[in-house]
Amino acid sequence: MKNSLLLVLSAIVLVFTGCKNGQKAEKDSENPFFSAYTTPFQVPPFDKIDTSHYLPAFVEGMKQHDAEIAAITDNTEAPTFENTILAFDKSGELLTRVSKVFFNVNEANTNEQMQEIAKKVSPLLSKHNDDISMNARLFERIKALYEKRGESGMDAQQVRVIEKYFRDFERQGANLPKDKQDQLRKINEQLSMLSINFGDNLLAETNKNFQLVIDNKADLDGLPESVVTAAAETAKNAGNDGKWMFTLSKPSLIPFLQYAKNRDLREKIYRGYFMRGNNDNANDNKKVVADMVRLRAEKALLLGFDNFAAYTIAENMAKTPANVSSFLDKLMVAAIPVAKKELAEMQKIADLEGATFKLQSWDWWFYAEKLRKQKYDLDENELKPYFSLTNVRDGMFAVAGKLYGITFNKLTDLPVYHNDVETFEVKEADGSHLGILYLDYYPRESKGGGAWCTDFLSSGWKDNKKVDPIISIVCNFTPPTGDMPALLNWDETSTLFHEFGHALHGLFTQGKYTRTAGNVPQDYVELPSQVMENWAGEPEVLRMYAKHYKTGEVIPDVLINKIQNSGLFNQGFDNVEYIAASVLDIDYHLLSPPAIVDVISFEKESMAKIGLIGEIWPRYRSTYFAHIFDGGYGAGYYVYLWAAVLDADAFDYFKQSGDIFNQDLAKSFRINCLTECGNDDGMVQYKKFRGQEPSLDPLLKKRGLK
């Protein structure tokens, strides 16, 4: 692997050194990454960025970063905060610039060229990062400042940055002997490539390798007209005019599972979904998973930890895997009986309809929808006309406006990476510029599944001037069809509010230092996002944005009451499938080398251990668990539930005040939990807002588990 890495690097260098100096200078001047953007608000000039620009920018970015590090280590003066920590904190500007654009676009609008570049550059970046984190001279300077941090006259934030960097270097192998560092380098390089492979395989399995094509209209029985229309359009775009096509993207999959009366076809598409990455083909992820689990276990041992879970969670609010497992066990004990009750109620419906079968996992959505209608007289298709994407978007903007006084102005003249993307300027109450927000709503073959929030430029400071953030929300919502706008179901509505919470976190965060500005423990990260979901379903808020897309009629109270009454609907299923996935994640990362051989057998044993009922699969099975194998959540998928305790407690604080838009609480939450969130430990910052540690009771009540 090391030799191939050198060959790749040599080939890249030859490409550029083979040009005459004049030609190279001309090429450099044409590369948008090689100078500060001249676009409005410093947004990436997507209209000028070509795929050919990425590799040269990565190579030059690493070269410049190396020079910046050398300037620090070659400094003959004694280490100070300014000549070591601050210099390091500000280094790597070009590399960061190209990395943010490349990896964000590769997730949201990829192609074969981008994927090949990712495979080339990932090992180079792994080596580059290891060269820095294992740089003995750099670590010596940081260590010297760390050891004198209490007597140097530095302020609290400077001390915190020093402590963070010192801990980072320790956790990345700076204290290891040379032979152990070489082992760690090899592991990091392999893990970076395996993660790329996992994501590429999953993208192909989800977007290319399965389609359910229907040519008999009778097989569409039960499906809403909007779903049928969308399926016809999908088929037409794929060259199957006159037929109907369903895919594994959630806007296509979930409605089919909810409404299609053809049970055999429900099973077929569901199996297509839960067998992703497990089909013994070129995109099979079983060996990728096994190798990643083994390598992570080896990495943890090298760094002095019993397992990768201990290594990861040590930096989180939970502190230890035992605390996480205890937390998950308590919730599973509460959730399993609720799920079993839901299953019994659905089986009763099926039996009364003359079913001669025991419900299976592919039946859950179909009979859950029937149960919702029976218990709450609530039909999701009755709701969707009130939740057009535009109205939901404007609703979340209005909530942020009432809480924080900010406004969102749509812009049409900024370059974007895809024509579907919308752009907004975000302003403070006084009219000053706060940041830019991109919104990318719809599925496409070039986009990964799910929803996420990222940034093209983080908030910070440069040359004593504030750098304003550029935030992006990426989703996979049901697209518009014909004259019908994009209509969201309740899950999609909650998802948009969720990702918007992340966006607000990115917009509001401030700090002098890159290492601490907005950087919080992983099990705190979902607090800003999940707390926003609470506002989406409040009656006062629903009346602000839930309006019929045809008539403009505000959602009637009868429907609001149904939404409120059905708040506990399907909570057993939702909680059990999530907890099961979290347990699977932790179990993988509690392993010691040589870890596992048979991924599927291990998965079955893990689920049997917690008593998972056969009708529910974990939310993500091993071979498509992108969060932990391609998303930075290894040994950390539990964090959504951990943060749910915080978000339920935080919103309960607003409710107790008698005003969900309480301005004093909103100001305190913004300052302590969003703007200054990286200034201290996560719980310390939360307690500054709440006045006490969070209680588990609001979450249990919210989810019907108490």
Where are these predicted regions, by residue range?
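Sec-dependent signal peptide recognition
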Residues: 2-9
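C-terminal motif of bacterial Sec signal peptides marking the signal peptidase cleavage site
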Residues: 15-18
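C-terminal, non-catalytic "cap/extension" segments appended to globular domains
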Residues: 24-49, 60, 243-245, 374, ...
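N-terminal helix-rich structural modules
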Residues: 25-223, 245
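Short His/Asp/Glu-rich catalytic/ion-coordination signatures at enzyme active sites or charged loops
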Residues: 38-53, 102-121, 144-186, 247-287, ...
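Short, hydrophobic/amphipathic alpha-helical patches that form generic packing surfaces
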Residues: 94-104, 163, 167, 271, ...
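Active-site-proximal, well-structured secondary-structure segments within enzyme catalytic domains
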Residues: 157, 161, 200, 204-247, ...
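Short pre-active-site segment immediately N-terminal to the catalytic Zn-binding motif
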Residues: 478-497
